[in-house]
Regions:
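Substrate-binding groove of N-acetylhexosamine-processing glycoside hydrolases
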Residues: 1-173
Length: 173
């Protein structure tokens, strides 16, 4: 069992975030991967009269696994973003940005994989307090946000990670 509140030294220092990442990567997501594979086999073996229900259940498992991956990506992003804010070495800062771009690509792949599942079952992504935060409209919106981050925001930010500024430093009066 995983009890995050029981991790010795977990405090505002950031250790908890790393413990969460370790648990997601080594325990939680692999367990969901195994569960999805078992459910795929169950769908194949399901009698015709239960196949539709079994397929919906498989979709729920796959959708939730995608949400776990999003959680992992968000936690990794948070850590890299904080490191980037305080990094004074341009080479290391650019390496951090490369890692951030990898996370964007992983999350875009994750979202694209779950869109057909959400389109097939409109109940997925609905949460009573937040409405359809995981519905297809929001999934496409998320892809647009990730593309903008990759193609615009991070590219402009990367230009600031150099002693050779790509624009004039002279001030106009």
């Amino acid at each position: 069992a995983y009890f995050p509140e029981m991790v010795f030294g977990a405090s505002a220092c950031g250790r908890m975030m790393h413990e969460d990442i370790k648990a997601l990567e080594n325990v939680v997501i692999p367990a969901w991967d195994r569960g999805v594979e078992l459910m795929k086999k169950a769908v194949e073996l399901a009698p015709v009269c239960r196949k539709a229900t079994a397929e919906k259940s498989l979709g729920v498992g796959m959708f939730f696994r995608a949400m776990l991956r999003s959680t992992l990506h968000n936690k990794k992003w948070f850590i890299l973003n904080r490191r980037l804010e305080i990094e004074n070495n341009f080479v290391i800062a650019n390496q951090i940005m490369d890692d951030m771009l990898k996370i964007i690509e992983q999350e875009m792949k994750n979202v694209r994989e779950v869109i057909p599942i959400a389109e097939n079952d409109s109940v997925l992504g609905w949460e009573p307090r937040m409405d359809y935060q995981g519905g297809t409209w929001h999934l496409y919106w998320k892809i647009r946000q990730l593309e903008n981050l990759r193609d615009n925001t991070l590219q402009v930010y990367r230009q600031t990670l150099s002693e050779n500024v790509p624009f004039s430093r002279e001030r106009t009066r």
